[in-house]
Amino acid sequence: MESTEKLTDTNAILAYLYETFPLCFIAEGETKPLKIGLFQDLAERLADDSKVSKTQLRIALRRYTSSWRYLKCVKAGAQRIDLDGNACGELEQEHIDHAAATLKESQDKAKAKRVAQAKSANPAAKTAKKPVKKPVAKRPKPAQSSKPAKEPVVAENLTPAVLTELKPNQRVNVKLGKAPVAGVILDIKKEDVQVQLDSGLTIKVRAEHILL
């Protein structure tokens, strides 16, 4: 005894219709508008076919006729066809306008969805960059920027540094002109000491120009 498995997947049912009615349901390329009332003809033609139910046929037919490929074929001058591919009259303008409106609405929804997805992805990228930029923006504006002008008051208590006493990240004063300027040692290479002043300026000086 042979048992026929009922098709439930819409794509599988469409594939079955492409195979059974190739002149009506076109799998690839430009389609043709279907005859009004074609569902009834389809149900009668497949009444003895246990593979598909009327409900599944209706769903598959709706999927086929709502696709962009089908809606694009509903245009002026096109002929409707029956299950055997026979012409059944030209389309009415009302149906052409309805198909065009449905196609535009569907395409607009798809476009809006793509835009929304793109926007939802961009904020994440922007917020990921902000934490990196914040520390850089704060560096040029240290709270101590107004203090260097007052440092000369204690200049009498400062003494020239010895190279061996210096180390990176150490707070020091650099002798520039008449008044020493406060800063932080960034790096020491041989006899050259790189210092970042509180003003944000980075300079390279000899150890004898550094005061402690």
Curated annotation (Swiss-Prot):
Subcellular location: Cytoplasm
Any Gene Ontology biological process: post-transcriptional regulation of gene expression
SUPFAM superfamilies documented for this protein: FinO-like
Region (Disordered): 107-153
GO cellular component: cytosol
Database matches in InterPro entries: ProQ, ProQ/FinO, ProQ/FinO_sf, ProQ_C
Pfam families membership: ProQ, ProQ_C
Biased composition (Low complexity): 117-126
Alphabetized UniProt keyword annotations: Chaperone, Cytoplasm, RNA-binding
Biased composition (Basic residues): 127-141
Molecular function GO labels: RNA strand annealing activity; RNA strand-exchange activity
SMART domains: ProQ
Role noted for this protein: RNA chaperone with significant RNA binding, RNA strand exchange and RNA duplexing activities.
Family in the record: Belongs to the ProQ family.
UniProt protein name: RNA chaperone ProQ
